[in-house]
Structure formats: C-alpha cells, structure tokens
Amino acid sequence: MRLPVLVVSVLAAALSLGACDQAGTSSTAMDGSLAAADGGIVSAAPRTVDPGSAHDNLNAVLWVQTSAEYRALSLQSFRAAADHLARALEEPNWDALVPSERANAGTGLQPAVIMDIDETVLDNSPYQARLVRSGEHYDEVSWAGWVAEKKAAALPGVVDFARAASIKGVTIIYISNRAQHLDEATIANLKAVGMPVKDADVFLGLGTHVEGCEQHGSEKNCRRQRIGRDYRVLMQFGDQLGDFVQVLSNTAEGRAALLEEYGDWFGERWWMLPNPTYGSWEPAAFNNDWGLPPEARRQAKRAALDVAP
C-alpha cells in the first residue's frame, strides 16, 4: 500500500533515532499511565541512577528540543492538515472514526477534531530533560508536579491549526491519558498556549466513564465512541498508533497490520506527530514485559534491529 509522503517522512524521522523510552518505565508514562502486558494500569516506581551514565532517552530528547527537523515535521503536519480541512467540512460523509467506533451515523452532527495532548499539542520535553539530567525516570509524583507547573509549550503549528478550525465552527476535543484529576491544570496549560477550549467537557482524561463501553487499560476507543455520539469527527491527531485506533495486539506484526489496514487514512483523516522519546512501539520489542530488567529489555531491542545481514 502506498503511504502519503508526509506519513513516511514522519515515521522515518521518529523511528530512525533509535532512542528508547526511559529505562524502567512504560511507553505510556508521559500520558500519566502505564500499560501492563495484560492491558491493565500499573504504577511506576522512581529509579535513580548515576547522572553521569548514559541515559536511554538522551538523543531522543535532544532531537526534540534542538533539531530544526523536529520543528519542520510538526509545522508540516499541521499545515497539511489545514489544507484538508475545507474538504473534510464539505463532504457530509467524511469521518475520521473507524466503523467499529461509530454506532450512529455521523452525517448531520456538529464537526469536531480529536487531539491527543502530550507530544501532540503540548511539548513535555523539559520534563524528560530533567529526568535525563538527574538520571531518574518517570514516576507519577514528578509527572503530576510537572503538569501542575503548567509550563508545557505548544508544538509548532498546532495553535494556528486549532484556531483556524475553531473559526470554521469545529470543536477541538482533547482525548488524553493524563489522569482525569489533572484536568484543571491541563486545561489551564492549553488555554495559556492559545489552544481553543470550548468548556471542561472537551477534556476526556484517563478514567472518563463511557456508558455502555468497557475501557481496557489506557485504550482510547471508548472515549472516541463517546465523542462520535455527538460529533462528526473530521480528523484525529496523535503521536501513538493507539491515538487513532484500538491496538489489540501490541506486537510489531500487530502494529504493522493496523498500518496496512488504515495507512491511507494518514495524511488525510489521521495526522501522526513524531515522538521518539516514548511509545508503545518500544515494549512491542520485548513482549510488553516491563518486569524484565532494563538490560534484558535493551537486549531484546538490540535483537529486534535489522542489520541487513
């Protein structure tokens, strides 16, 4: 299947770094939750190491914070999405929800765009940078403290896109794996960077109850279904595959199959932002077993590398 050039460039840029998540944490740590192998939510314990030793996330965080390439990819994504917005509004059957997540017809509903927050709207790389410098790793206490600071900046291009969509009558919906109790600080941060926030109901954090749908772990499918009851979803933005569709099998093969099935949606209805610092792509390399020692996980990731023998 031919993928849009934009998609290929974003995926290539993110994956080529080869930088993994903070050792000893989950791939979804920055969303405020940890996905266990069985799909449940577990807590991360802080782990202190020698600050002078190599940190798994150093190159990835440095790239996000300093490279022109990262900024260019972000600008490119949001500008390209803006170019598709008029067409999405004009076509009454345009829908960015997969069929299994829409129980009702979207035609005639008010338009909306669904956005993940962390590393899609807000840049949390300063929090990551602190962990790299200190030699520590994600934990819920330090993460909640960072959220409370409300210092996350907006990704390049996102505010311009969101404001343009809002002017056209499109509601911006935020589906995030930040815990629901972090809503006030999160909404304040969104408003501070200039993002449109219609009301408190547009933030659907982890733990949001959706009647008639049982949420598994940190999956977002139930919350997407809830939005689909009231809105015609024109586009979705995220930095993880699970921001767009439910990932039932978090293996390299399972993830590749989803991309094969929905590849044509990227660059049109779905817009992926680069995030080399963490993601569910990492535990897919070691069978989602966060109980393995850090070095065992690194060995599994090395074994997954393609060296073109």
Predicted segments, located by residue:
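Second-shell loop/turn segments in exported
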Residues: 62-74, 144-151, 173-178, 210-214
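Positively charged n-region of N-terminal signal peptides that target proteins for export
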Residues: 1-4
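Substrate-recognition element of Asp-dependent hydrolases with the DxDx(T/V) motif
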Residues: 119, 158-190, 202-205, 239-241
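Non-catalytic pre-domain segments flanking phosphatase-related domains
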Residues: 20-115, 287-309
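C-terminal cap/substrate-recognition subdomain and adjoining C-terminal extension
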Residues: 29-32, 183-309
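Bacterial N-terminal signal peptides
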Residues: 7-18
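Active-site neighborhood of HAD-like aspartate-dependent phosphohydrolases
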Residues: 110-112, 121-156, 160-163, 167
